[in-house]
Amino acid sequence: PIELPARPYQTYVSVSIKAKGKGTLFIGAIHKRWSRLELGQFILGGKRYSDENKQEFIHYFHPGDLKPPLNVYFSGYRTAEGFEGYFMMKRMNAPFILIADPRIEGGAFYLGSENYEQAIRKVIQNALDYLGFANNQLILSGLSMGSFGALYYATKLNPAAVIVGKPLINLGTIANNMKLVRPNDFGTSLDILRLNQNDITNKDVVQLDNHFWKQIQHSDLSMTTFAIAYMEHDDYDKYAFQDLLPVLTKQHARVISKRIPGRHNDDSATVTHWFINFYHLIMEERFGRVTHARR
């Protein structure tokens, strides 16, 4: 990275690229980010991972009071690069990890190469090992795009609970819905389809959808509690909850749900309220932690 010192006045930054010779030049995205120099990425203690294809995610670990559970929050779609949910997670006092995906425009749903996905699991497992926790002392959570990260990595980590709001699961269908269901809205979904499948045909839509379902159908989530707040008229992934419930029921997972009227981007305040309520409920019931909000 190129470090530009802060200035007391407004200015512009321009980038020029010069190339000479024969071959193919690939130019990726240019990112402008706050620097903490050697003290962290974005915030003090923040870290960045990049795989062999320069696909990256960022993560931050806070040890809290060193008592279970370890709460992991996957950031939702956001064009402003950085961490999401810091103060919300910190108020719970428990150890937590923030994970964010700054790829494409707003995030690529935490899917990637084998090394990329293994690195996300390793970040979580290393924190569990540091704290001396087992996987049944882990909660994965996220809203919207972050819900996919929580649900997807739950199939690999077998946490105590998964807490999600506005779940998005069928990523191929989300891209396909841009034709008629929500024209010109969330074009990033097409980029995600092409990133993972190299094309945007109907076959690619089905294959990307099936990527998640193959994972969850070959996992054991019988000891995991799922708390899900979903939109009744979701125009991104309308049947996400209806598709997920039979699979979780078959695995004898415990499911707590709240249906909220509206489309995907409606009534975020109510969804967030239920998301936090689910956290308080599970932390008290499973771990004996009574938060200030429930006293």
Please describe what each predicted stretch is.
Residues 110-133:
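Alpha/beta-hydrolase active-site loop
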Residues 45-94, 98-105, 228:
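Short, surface-exposed "cap/lid" segments of acyl-processing enzymes
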Residues 155-197:
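Hydrolase active-site cap/lid region
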Residues 9, 91-97, 134, 246-259:
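Structural alpha-beta junctions
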Residues 1-45:
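Beta-strand-enriched, solvent-exposed domains that form extended recognition/catalytic surfaces
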Residues 149-153:
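Hydrolases whose catalytic domains are alpha/beta-hydrolase-1, hotdog thioesterase
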Residues 181-258, 264-294:
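The feature captures the conserved acid-bearing segment of alpha/beta-hydrolase catalytic domains
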Residues 132-146:
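Alpha/beta-hydrolase fold nucleophile elbow
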